[in-house]
Amino acid sequence: MKKFSLISDYDVYLFKEGTHTRLYDKLGSHVIELNGKRYTFFAVWAPHADYVSLIGDFNEWDKGSTPMVKREDGSGIWEVLLEGDLTGSKYKYFIKNGNYEVDKSDPFAFFCEQPPGNASVVWKLNYRWNDSEYMKKRKRVNSHDSPISIYEVHVGSWRRVPEEGNRFLSYRELAEYLPYYVKEMGFTHVEFLPVMEHPFYGSWGYQITGYFAPTSRYGTPQDFMYLIDKLHQEGIGVILDWVPSHFPTDAHGLAYFDGTHLYEYEDWRKRWHPDWNSFVFDYGKPEVRSFLLSSAHFWLDKYHADGLRVDAVASMLYLDYSRKEWVPNIYGGKENLEAIEFLRKFNESVYRNFPDVQTIAEESTAWPMVSRPTYVGGLGFGMKWNMGWMNDTLFYFSKDPIYRKYHHEVLTFSIWYAFSENFVLPLSHDEVVHGKGSLIGKMPGDYWQKFANLRALFGYMWAHPGKKLLFMGGEFGQFKEWDHETSLDWHLLEYPSHRGIQRLVKDLNEVYRREKALHETDFSPEGFEWVDFHDWEKSVISFLRKDKSGKEIILVVCNFTPVPRYDYRVGVPKGGYWREIMNTDAKEYWGSGMGNLGGKEADKIPWHGRKFSLSLTLPPLSVIYLKHEG
């Protein structure tokens, strides 16, 4: 137990300044070599503790046998060096502060005991990656003018093994199926609901205790690296959900860590999160900022993640979020100035160190400039979920078509703010739980109409400006609400109706990726032009999508009633042939097969303020795309 430390004075300086982004190399447990011998170094931050000792299966969990030594530099860090390579050993920290005694998991552990156990495990993160080709080109994959279509996945319930007690697939088993399915379906990215270690499976990963450890339910850190590696080898980007907004109050976790409110706010009005029964990080504390910044950088560095989707940003920004009693900021306002500053520093640091990735905010209010650079006063995120579009669109589609004409403005409103942020259009897990029903369950009408409505929704979504996100199961019209305890209902693909939806999503992804007009200008008003949004009586809208050059043009016409429209005239800017490249009513998608025989020649009849027009057949409950071919 010789005098040795991985932690330099400069590390302590950065830690206390709130700017350390690689604490995972310093704190926690690390196997090292000194003079040809192996040792395991442990370090934990517990500034208010009177006594800290290391307990584990190597000392029979004896609280007195391995005391740690507190550094004398005021950092509050305790350290100990043990002989031998302790990889695979379970351990915790015994912390004493006056009469308060507790066994804590390591906040920086790379691996944890399988729940319900909660000990930390000494682990090395060595892994030989095979994704160098992908990493070289990923700047293109993740860029704003590239197609980004995200498949949102919960690892524990995408697929299960019913023959073996309905067990989960492991990370490695998932790696044999998921990358190929996602590639076949044409999605560009997978977004995992949080994989960071969480004690309660029913939290879907959103109540994290291990900010540096993938959950051991599905395998080891190397197994999770293998899954990401395989996705990358198939050209699929990986976005990880990350939760810096709150953490659970489990006794072994971060809460009341050293007998004081160390990681969380001191004042209960800022500390307590009533929605989730959890604690809020103290963003004003530099060491907590260093902890969170290090966690974010860790997943991008060690796990090659392509992006972080930051959960519940609104709850961080507002001091009165879901609270009756709250503390105003120094100016008397409700904005959490410390959280705002942290989010800006987080985005600046991530983009400085990993310029090829994206940060994505789930932010449910109209907070301005979430996805604008910090130097113009924004929060600095790369993209933001468009919750307004999601709410309005699902509200509209849930209405019986006979009443849709009275809600026409709900549908058209989204374009008024569509370019105020870099938006992702999310049909996420949140829309198919808690009694909300599945996507197809929200659709009105009989069996055929439900499928036609869902096909029309997808056709409209893929044509609307913004990147795409769809939660697993939606792509084949799962009828049941999502249940994290069971697999998706893959057997539904025996039915042509569900196969049709799946084929449509695959083809929409293919068209979206192929056509620059549908993805290059997702964030630019120059790429969108209304043709007609006034036909509320028939519930028909039409618009153009264009590429950056303005030369490639696609006309999108949506008919949101089950009434076919014949000889429906739509104005277009150019003469010549317009080829039908997508029709959600096609027979292959279990539609009625109505359409425009592959395309239409423009008539020299002025319409909708344009010199030319097309006389179209609009199938019932459908969306059609026509590309100008000259």
Curated annotation (Swiss-Prot):
Pathway this chain belongs to: Glycan biosynthesis; glycogen biosynthesis
UniProt-listed GO biological process terms: glycogen biosynthetic process
Gene3D superfamilies with a match to the protein in the record: Glycosidases (3.20.20.80), Golgi alpha-mannosidase II (2.60.40.1180), Immunoglobulins (2.60.40.10)
Alphabetic keyword roster: Carbohydrate metabolism, Glycogen biosynthesis, Glycogen metabolism, Glycosyltransferase, Transferase
The protein's role, per its UniProt record: Catalyzes the formation of the alpha-1,6-glucosidic linkages in glycogen by scission of a 1,4-alpha-linked oligosaccharide from growing alpha-1,4-glucan chains and the subsequent attachment of the oligosaccharide to the alpha-1,6 position.
Subunit structure and binding partners: Monomer.
Protein name: 1,4-alpha-glucan branching enzyme GlgB
Originating species: Aquifex aeolicus (strain VF5)
Encoding gene per record: glgB
